[in-house]
C-alpha cells in the first residue's frame, strides 16, 4: 500500500532527482532580465536587501519619551509684558514720536525762515546804492549791517561791488577828531590866527567830503603831520595839567598851542 501511494506520488509530482531547480535556469533568467531591464544591476546596488537587519527597527529600540505639556503662549506674553511694562513703553514711545515731530517741525521752520531771510537780504543788498551806504560810514560796519537789516557778508560783498575795498569808519572818525582839535585850538588862540585856522578847517572839511565819496582815498601828508602835532600837543597838555601849577600849565598850553599853530601854518602852505 505504501509502495503504491509512493508510486502515484512520483508519477504525479515527479521524483526528487528530477525536481525543477532555479539554479539550472539562473543563467537564462539573468540573461533575459539583463536584456529586458538594463538598469537591474543599478537597482540592486541602490536598493537595500530585504533581509538586512537595518531595514526595519524593532519597536523595542524606541525610547519612551516623557509627557510634555503644551506651551502656553498667553502666559509667555503676560510674563514679557509684566517685565517690560507695556503701558509705560507705549507712553514713552508716543512721547518720543511727538518730540521727534516737534523737532522736525522746528528745523523745517528754521530752514524756511533762513531761506526767506537770505532771499530778502540778497534782494535788499542789490538795491543798495553807494549814496545810501555812505550815510552809515560814521558807524562800525557791524552796526551798519544791523541798521540796514542785511547780513555782514552781504554788506561787504555789496561794498566790493561798488568799489569800496575798506570800510572808512576809522578814517572818518580820525578826521573828525582832528577837526574838533583844530576848533579847540581856534578858541585858545583867539582872533590872532583865526583866518589861518579857519582855512585849515575848510580844507579838512573838504577832505572829509571827498573821503565820503571816495572811501579808498588816503590822507594827505599835511593832514598826517597836523594830526600828529595835535596829538602831541593834547598829550603834553594833559600830562602837565595834573603835575604842575596853574602858571606852568598855562605856559605849557601856550607852548603846545604854538607848536600846533606852526603845524597849521605848514598845513596851509
From Swiss-Prot:
Gene of this entry: RKD1
Assigned keywords, A-Z: Coiled coil, DNA-binding, Nucleus, Transcription, Transcription regulation
Organism name: Arabidopsis thaliana
GO cellular component: nucleus
Reported function: Putative transcription factor.
Keyword Nucleus: yes
Protein name: Protein RKD1
Domain RWP-RK: start-end pairs: 106-195
TM region(s), chain numbering: none
Amino acid at each position: 500500500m505504501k509502495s503504491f501511494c509512493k508510486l502515484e506520488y512520483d508519477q504525479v509530482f515527479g521524483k526528487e532527482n528530477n525536481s525543477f531547480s532555479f539554479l539550472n535556469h539562473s543563467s537564462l533568467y539573468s540573461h533575459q532580465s539583463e536584456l529586458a531591464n538594463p538598469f537591474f544591476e543599478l537597482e540592486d546596488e541602490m536598493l537595500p536587501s530585504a533581509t538586512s537587519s537595518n531595514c526595519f527597527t524593532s519597536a523595542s529600540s524606541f525610547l519612551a519619551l516623557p509627557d510634555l505639556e503644551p506651551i502656553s503662549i498667553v502666559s509667555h506674553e503676560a510674563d514679557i509684558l509684566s517685565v517690560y511694562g507695556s503701558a509705560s513703553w507705549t507712553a514713552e514711545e508716543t512721547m518720543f514720536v511727538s518730540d521727534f515731530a516737534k523737532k522736525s517741525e522746528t528745523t523745517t521752520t528754521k530752514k524756511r525762515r533762513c531761506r526767506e531771510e537770505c532771499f530778502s537780504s540778497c534782494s535788499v543788498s542789490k538795491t543798495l546804492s553807494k549814496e545810501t551806504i555812505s550815510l552809515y560810514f560814521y558807524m562800525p560796519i557791524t552796526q551798519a549791517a544791523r541798521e540796514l537789516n542785511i547780513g555782514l557778508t552781504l554788506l561787504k560783498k555789496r561794498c566790493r561791488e561798488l568799489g569800496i575795498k575798506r570800510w572808512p569808519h576809522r578814517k572818518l572818525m580820525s578826521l573828525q577828531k582832528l577837526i574838533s582839535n583844530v576848533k579847540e585850538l581856534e578858541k585858545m588862540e583867539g582872533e590872532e590866527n583865526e583866518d589861518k585856522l579857519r582855512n585849515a578847517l575848510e580844507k579838512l572839511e573838504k577832505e572829509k567830503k571827498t573821503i565820503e565819496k571816495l572811501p579808498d582815498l588816503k590822507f594827505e601828508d599835511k593832514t598826517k603831520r597836523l594830526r600828529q602835532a595835535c596829538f602831541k600837543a593834547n598829550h603834553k597838555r594833559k600830562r602837565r595839567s595834573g603835575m604842575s601849577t596853574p602858571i606852568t600849565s598855562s605856559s605849557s598850553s601856550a607852548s603846545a598851542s604854538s607848536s600846533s599853530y606852526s603845524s597849521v601854518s605848514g598845513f596851509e602852505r
